[in-house]
Amino acid sequence: MNRLKAKYQDEIVKVMMEKFNYTSVMQAPKVDKIVINMGVGDAVTNTKALDMAVEELQLLTGQKPLITKAKKSIAGFKLREGMPIGAKVTLRGERMYEFLDKLINVSLPRVRDFRGVSKKSFDGRGNYTLGVKEQLIFPEIDYDRVSKVRGMDIVIVTTANTDEESRELLTALGMPFQK
C-alpha cells in the first residue's frame, strides 16, 4: 500500500472527522481521481509533437494517455474539428496515490523559485487545479530527450463538498500551499 494512502487511512480521516464533526467515516473527503491534461498546440502542424507529449505522459503516469481532439473548427488556428490537439490521463487508485506522492515530495520542490502552490485554485466544489509550466520537474523526464518544454494541467478531484474541506485534506496530505 502506498504511504500516502496509509497516512490518509490511519491519520487524516480521524483528524477530518473531528474537525468537521462527521458522524461516519465515509463522510470524510478523499482524493477521487487526478486528471493530467497536456494541450499540444503545435500538434496541428507537427504530429511528432503530439507523439512526444503522449510518450512523456506515459512515462509520468504509467498508463496510456487518451488523445484529445478538437471539438470545433477554428480557422484562425488552422484547426479542423476532430484533429488531435492534446493528451490526457485519468489516474485512480494506487497509481493516483503514487503520482500525488511523487508530485508533492519530489516534483514541486524542483520548481525554480518555488514558494508553494496557490490557495486560489479551488473551483468552489472541492477540486484543485494546478498548472505546471514545464514537464522537466518530473524525474522521469530526461532533459536531453525533450524536444520542447511543455506545461500541463493537473486537476485533483476530491469528494469534498467545500473548498475548505478540500484544502484541509490536501494540506494534511502534504500539499505545500503558499503562506
Swiss-Prot record:
Function noted in UniProt = This is one of the proteins that bind and probably mediate the attachment of the 5S RNA into the large ribosomal subunit, where it forms part of the central protuberance. In the 70S ribosome it contacts protein S13 of the 30S subunit (bridge B1b), connecting the 2 subunits; this bridge is implicated in subunit movement. Contacts the P site tRNA; the 5S rRNA and some of its associated proteins might help stabilize positioning of ribosome-bound tRNAs.
The record's InterPro entries line, in alphabetical order, gives: Ribosomal_uL5, Ribosomal_uL5_bac-type, Ribosomal_uL5_C, Ribosomal_uL5_CS, Ribosomal_uL5_dom_sf, Ribosomal_uL5_N
Q: How does it assemble?
A: Part of the 50S ribosomal subunit; part of the 5S rRNA/L5/L18/L25 subcomplex. Contacts the 5S rRNA and the P site tRNA. Forms a bridge to the 30S subunit in the 70S ribosome.
- A cellular component term, taken from the record's GO annotations: ribosome
Q: Name a Pfam family for this protein.
A: Ribosomal_L5_C
This protein's record includes keyword Kinase = no
The record's listing under SUPFAM superfamilies reads: RL5-like (SSF55282)
Keyword annotations from UniProtKB, A to Z: Ribonucleoprotein, Ribosomal protein, RNA-binding, rRNA-binding, tRNA-binding
Gene Ontology BP terms: translation
Q: Which organism is it from?
A: Exiguobacterium sibiricum (strain DSM 17290 / CCUG 55495 / CIP 109462 / JCM 13490 / 255-15)
The organism's place on the tree of life at top rank:
Bacteria
Write out the similarity annotation. Belongs to the universal ribosomal protein uL5 family.
Q: Which residues form a coiled coil?
A: none
* Protein name as annotated: Large ribosomal subunit protein uL5
Gene name in the database record: rplE
Q: Name one GO molecular function term.
A: structural constituent of ribosome
